[in-house]
Amino acid sequence: MLKVAIVGKPNVGKSTLFNRIIKVNKSIVDDKPGITRDRIYANAEWLTQHFKLIDTGGLMLDEFDFKKQIELQVNYAITEADVIVFLVSYKEGINNDDHYVAKILKKHKNKKILLAVNKSETRNKDSYDDHEYLRFGFQKPYFISANHGIGIGDLLDAIVDTKLKEIKEEDTFKFCIIGRPNVGKSSLVNCILNEDRMITSNIANTTRDAIDSNFKKDNLLYTIIDTAGIRRKGKIQENVDKYAYLRVEQSISRSNLIVIVLDGSEEFNEQDEVIAGLAHKANIPSIIVVNKWDIVKEKDEKTMNKFIKTIRIKFKFLSWTPIVFLSAIENKRINTLFNEIKSIRENLNLKFNSKILTDLVFKLQMLNSPPLFNRGRIKINHVTQVDGQIPTFVLFCNNPEYLHFSYARYLENEIRKSLGLNNVPITLYFKNKTDKIRGKKNDK
């Protein structure tokens, strides 16, 4: 797939252009320079042509916090991109930072570089000011306004004009990594990808955007989504933190699996429980990762069991969730995490015959009869699986409105156990036997 990177100094509108092209507010946009620190990926389409778009942090000549890390991220993006959109601002004009970026880009002569002049909505179309931008040596400039959508079509025409061999996209399994700030989420991503994909430091919240990374392991495709650390709502004061909190919820909504990262070197707190609650609310599989296991003091053979017991008490609503102990910074026990991810992926794809399901539920009713109600006893006479993000089963019975939630929970736990679905949530729908099934059956 064609890869396109947007590069430029801070505050020229890179993230606004990124969002305009993908039609989603994926990058955090604010007037404050340096809001985008990592490189951010998204799929885009123009005139039926698909391409991968990359947003990057701003480059500056002067020294500033995270300069080396941001330059490393931008260089990664430039290296992997086929097309580079060099973005400058008509409103602010050209300065030394723009020439600094141009100097970096000129080292990549094998790349297609498109110069785009953003914030040009006030420019007179009849003006002859191209010469100022032609000095960069990147052919004619494209005058655009990312905010107003002006000139974007011409720029996209030039982007998709790049010829590449078509690569068929395969199914990918998406999982997001969530947790409070500084528990090691980005270190875990870097460990998995074997590169400094994220900017990491001891300063809380050095990752602000949700960032997608595609990779392959054991011939299976994955997309990993790293998110900003979630602070307590009372401490969310800056717009950036509010945006990041919403981005975490969006990341969860497009994931197949949630990895909840805890800091093993500190006591678990209320915010950890709030974050785990987001995973529970999403009703998709999750894994609890106890990170920084290398610096947990005075470990013995009982330490891990003590942690597990504490987690099961604090996060009792995630009783089925696997727990993994690892050290991202030392790259230890990472395979344990992937064994769980692979197992969950396989379980989500399992399909069960209706006869097997019906026989199972019949036996469960024999072992523990449904409670009585004023019209008699509820009887479940048929079960089928339908399509869903998690294993989803429809149980047909008489008077489902009288089924007590405790009996539904009994069936859910026993069905999960009997079918070997111990590490994923399942959904049960109780329908009147005269109701029609919505969704595709799995009766093979």
UniProtKB/Swiss-Prot annotation:
Boundaries of each KH-like domain copy?
350-434
Q: Kindly list the positions annotated as binding GTP 1.
A: 8-15, 55-59, 118-121
Q: Which domain of life is it from?
A: Bacteria
Q: Which InterPro entries match?
A: G_ENGA, GTP-bd, GTPase_Der, KH_dom-like, KH_dom-like_a/b, P-loop_NTPase, Small_GTP-bd
Please list the residues that bind GTP 2.
179-186, 226-230, 291-294
> What's one Pfam family the UniProt record gives for this protein?
KH_dom-like
One GO process term, biological-process aspect: ribosome biogenesis
Enumerate the spans annotated as EngA-type G domain: 2-167, 173-349
> What are the record keywords, sorted?
GTP-binding, Nucleotide-binding, Repeat, Ribosome biogenesis
Report a single Gene Ontology molecular function: GTP binding
Q: Which family does it belong to?
A: Belongs to the TRAFAC class TrmE-Era-EngA-EngB-Septin-like GTPase superfamily. EngA (Der) GTPase family.
Question: What does it do?
Answer: GTPase that plays an essential role in the late steps of ribosome biogenesis.
Q: Kindly state the subunit structure of this protein.
A: Associates with the 50S ribosomal subunit.
User: What name appears for this protein in its UniProt entry?
Assistant: GTPase Der
Source species, please? Answer: Malacoplasma penetrans (strain HF-2) (Mycoplasma penetrans)
